[in-house]
Amino acid sequence: MATSAVPSENLPTYKLVVVGDGGVGKSALTIQFFQKIFVPDYDPTIEDSYLKHTEIDNQWAILDVLDTAGQEEFSAMREQYMRTGDGFLIVYSVTDKASFEHVDRFHQLILRVKDRESFPMILVANKVDLMHLRKVTRDQGKEMATKYNIPYIETSAKDPPLNVDKTFHDLVRVIRQQVPEKNQKKKKKTKWRGDRATGTHKLQCVIL
């Protein structure tokens, strides 16, 4: 089956933000999605953005993904990227009960910054390949997602990956349901523009 050519212009851009505690596997998920490799260790002090043309449900789009740092010292940057994000993946590790308990903090902060009662988000239960270390059950995750009225998905970035592409694609689908695509084309360019050649750009925190 032939692959359709990538349109060169007039593509909608979706700014997706990956949030969650440090060490839950946000970078591993993002790198697996963009580069199709599993990186078990990653510098926790770096925030990266990635740019990718992708086809979802026969519609091409540009995904501009910000992989955020989970450490508290970067908390001052959170409101900035939350203001410009079109959708959010709230990630926790099923092996880390504290990261699950902190989901509420991220959820409430997003709604407060957006000044909305609801916003495109997906609750992501990561590291499900580590079944012997699992501390948060599927039912607990689903219950929390139902409480927030957002989708729930279980993932693993480790090869072979589980639901990695689906997670990012599903978030775009949620955004499309709420925001007409024609309006997406009129949006201003992202503030965390990635390098088109490498698909990644290191962000720096400036303290005023």
UniProtKB/Swiss-Prot annotation:
Pfam families, A to Z: Ras
Binding site for GTP: 21-28, 38-40, 42, 44-45, 70, 126-127, 129, 156-158
Family that this chain belongs to: Belongs to the small GTPase superfamily. Ras family.
Organism: Mus musculus (Mouse)
Residue positions of motif Effector region: 42-50
Stretches assigned to coiled coil: none
Lineage: Eukaryota, Metazoa, Chordata, Craniata, Vertebrata
EC number in record: 3.6.5.2
The protein's name in its UniProt record: Ras-related protein M-Ras
Principal location: membrane
GO annotation, biological process: cellular response to leukemia inhibitory factor; Ras protein signal transduction
Annotated localization: Cell membrane
Entry-annotated residues carrying Cysteine methyl ester: C205
Gene name in the database record: Mras
